[in-house]
Swiss-Prot record:
Record GO cellular component, one term: DNA-directed RNA polymerase complex
SUPFAM superfamilies to which the protein is assigned, alphabetical: C-terminal domain of RNA polymerase alpha subunit, Insert subdomain of RNA polymerase alpha subunit, RBP11-like subunits of RNA polymerase
Presence of keyword Transferase: yes
Subunit structure, as described in the record: Homodimer. The RNAP catalytic core consists of 2 alpha, 1 beta, 1 beta' and 1 omega subunit. When a sigma factor is associated with the core the holoenzyme is formed, which can initiate transcription.
Taxonomic placement: Bacteria, Pseudomonadati, Pseudomonadota, Betaproteobacteria, Nitrosomonadales
The name this protein goes by in its record: DNA-directed RNA polymerase subunit alpha
Start and end residues of each stretch annotated as Alpha C-terminal domain (alpha-CTD): 247-336
Gene3D superfamilies for the chain: 5' to 3' exonuclease, C-terminal subdomain (1.10.150.20), DNA-directed RNA polymerase, insert domain (2.170.120.12), RNA polymerase, RBP11-like subunit (3.30.1360.10)
Domain notes: The N-terminal domain is essential for RNAP assembly and basal transcription, whereas the C-terminal domain is involved in interaction with transcriptional regulators and with upstream promoter elements.
Annotated InterPro entries: DNA-dir_RNA_pol_insert, DNA-dir_RNA_pol_RpoA/D/Rpb3, DNA-dir_RpoA, RBP11-like, RNAP_asu_C, RNApol_insert_sf
EC number(s) given by UniProt: 2.7.7.6
Keywords: DNA-directed RNA polymerase, Nucleotidyltransferase, Transcription, Transferase
Family per record: Belongs to the RNA polymerase alpha chain family.
HAMAP family: RNApol_bact_RpoA
Length: 336
């Protein structure tokens, strides 16, 4: 079956409404293809265009995100929200960089105050991060990374957690440089044919990517994904027997095996934390909200876990297992 009879669309016009906002006109499409391809492009633009975002911050004098900073109008939560609004670009194929923010003079702290390396470009230097009052100052280390989509801090890998130190705050990262996308389909004409489609994509970015470039990237993603179907052959799928999830035996041990102080152990049990697998999924901030569990107890827990190559904030896909009691009764899994 030949597809040569289909018309080939092209970008015929780009209306640059502002540096961040453009309307891209493409035609001609066969009747109905404007909606089909317009919806596909919109979904890829919103979900799959790569970008950069802050993923971790360490602020001098701050141990967790619920702190306040003397001499700063904003609390740490507001400061983090403002940091997420900084638009960056990483050059020379870099995927990560650590930036420094230092300011001790009274006034407004903007993205332009961040000391960027030659591989990092700050797109919106006038973006307000904080306000310093008399006698205040701010010192922070900001880790920025390249990625795509949305990356919740709770989904970070074990390596990210173990490499973090006290005072490091992991951020929920939204990498997408696309702020808004919509599309409209109008009638188009080629010679005597009047039943064709014209596709108009209205796209707004954060300034780190050109709107037309973003559309070309989205189209390339779709072409690569659909190319598989062009050579599609019928092949039987191998049948696999479902496997029981493998649970690390140490996660099935009771927290009593950690030999914590009585105060720390009692605090954990009040929070229904009975197994090591329960404990490692809690974050520092969650434990600090536990009644009677302070920074000293938290440090004790972290040190004991570190001695077993574990850390707080780890994500377990199959916890708790549906047959937890059976796991514990198996040979080698006994709690004591």
């Amino acid at each position: 079956m030949s597809s040569n009879s289909f018309l080939t669309p092209r970008i015929v016009e780009v209306h640059n409404i502002s540096p961040l906002h453009a309307k891209v006109v493409m035609e001609p499409f066969e009747h109905g293809f404007g909606y089909t391809l317009g919806n596909a492009l919109r979904r890829v633009l919103l979900s799959s265009i790569p970008g950069c975002a802050p993923t971790k911050v360490s602020i001098s004098g701050v141990v967790h995100e619920y702190s306040t900073i003397d001499g700063l109008q904003e609390d740490v939560v507001d400061l983090i929200l403002n940091l997420k609004g900084v638009v960056l670009k990483l050059h020379n194929n870099k995927t990560q960089s650590v930036l420094t923010l230092k300011k001790s003079s009274e006034g407004i702290v903007t993205a332009g105050d961040i000391e960027a390396t030659h591989d990092v470009e700050i797109v919106n230097p006038d973006h307000v991060i904080a306000h310093i009052t008399s006698g205040g100052k701010i010192e922070a280390q900001i880790t920025v990374e390249k990625g795509r989509g949305y990356w919740p801090s709770a989904n970070r890998s074990k390596e990210d957690k173990s490499s973090s130190s006290i005072g490091d705050i992991l951020l929920d990262a939204s990498f997408s440089p696309i702020r808004r996308v919509s599309y409209a389909v109008e009638s188009a004409r080629v010679e005597q044919r009047t039943d064709l489609d014209k596709l108009i994509i209205d796209i707004e970015t954060n300034g780190s990517v050109d709107p037309e470039e973003a559309i070309r990237y989205a189209a390339k993603v779709l072409v690569e994904q659909f190319s598989f179907f062009a050579d599609l052959e019928s092949t039987p799928l191998p049948t696999e027997q479902p496997k029981a999830p493998v649970i690390d035996p140490i996660l099935l041990r009771p927290v009593d095996d950690l030999e914590l102080t009585v105060r720390s152990a009692n605090c954990l049990k009040v929070e229904n934390i009975f197994y090591i697998g329960d404990l490692i999924q809690r974050t520092e901030a969650e434990l600090l909200r536990t009644p009677n569990l302070g920074r000293k107890s938290l440090n004790e827990i972290k040190e004991v876990l570190a001695s077993r190559d574990l850390s707080l904030g780890m994500k377990l896909e199959n916890w708790p297992p549906a047959n937890l009691e059976n796991y514990i009764k198996e040979p080698g899994h006994a709690s004591s």
